[in-house]
């Protein structure tokens, strides 16, 4: 199976969990809107290519890792498009999540996609140490001091240390590329 098919299947499976009984239907729809139709899927493609080059021994884990990276990327786009940041009315040629579903649901959608990224990785059977390492890499790419959250927070500062902000962007890319 080719990389694009693997990525799309992993994302469809992950986002499909939002259709579980009890999940608010508007949240599920907003999550689908954020993830599909697809963008370039650069991050998961790189993930799959690196795993293949390193002798991939757990395709399910590779697919989950790629999906997790894409879910985090989509979450960052949902949050970044909101009026409190970039106020972007469109994303990928259609209304951004906040324009289509409102600000409160957009905020929850971004948060739900972050949680879903971790859940997607956690569901794959693998060695505990390997899973812990992957979860740490993913959490570093999202959190503090250099992840997506830190990068977004730098945009809220009245004075920006450009060198530190640049380092933050590099760490975010490095963590995602591990």
Named regions from a protein language model:
Residues 1-65, 72, 78, 84-87, ...:
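Conserved N-terminal diphosphate/IPP-binding helix and adjacent helical/loop segment
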Residues 87-112, 159-170:
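Divalent-cation-assisted or electrostatically stabilized phosphate/pyrophosphate-binding catalytic cores
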Residues 112-125, 138-141, 145, 173:
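Histidine- and acidic-residue-rich, metal-dependent catalytic cores
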Residues 9, 107, 111-115, 119, ...:
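Residues on a specific face of well-ordered alpha-helices
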Residues 24, 62, 102, 106, ...:
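Membrane-interface starts of transmembrane alpha-helices
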């Amino acid at each position: 199976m080719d990389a694009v098919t693997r990525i799309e299947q992993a994302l469809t499976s992950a986002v499909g969990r939002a259709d579980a009984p009890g999940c608010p239907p508007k949240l599920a729809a907003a999550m689908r809107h954020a993830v599909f139709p697809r963008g370039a899927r650069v991050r998961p493609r790189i993930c799959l290519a690196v795993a293949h080059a390193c002798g991939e021994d757990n395709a399910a884990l590779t697919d989950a890792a790629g999906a997790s990276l894409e879910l985090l990327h989509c979450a960052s786009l949902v949050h970044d498009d909101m009026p409190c940041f970039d106020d972007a009315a469109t994303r990928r040629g259609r209304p951004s999540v906040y324009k289509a579903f409102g600000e409160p649901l957009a905020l929850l959608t971004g948060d739900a996609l972050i949680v879903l990224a971790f859940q997607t990785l956690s569901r794959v059977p693998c060695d505990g140490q390997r899973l812990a390492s992957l979860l740490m890499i993913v959490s570093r790419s999202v959190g503090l001091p250099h992840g997506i959250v830190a990068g977004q927070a730098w945009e809220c500062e009245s004075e920006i240390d450009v060198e530190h902000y640049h380092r933050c962007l590099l760490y975010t890319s490095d963590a995602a590329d591990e």
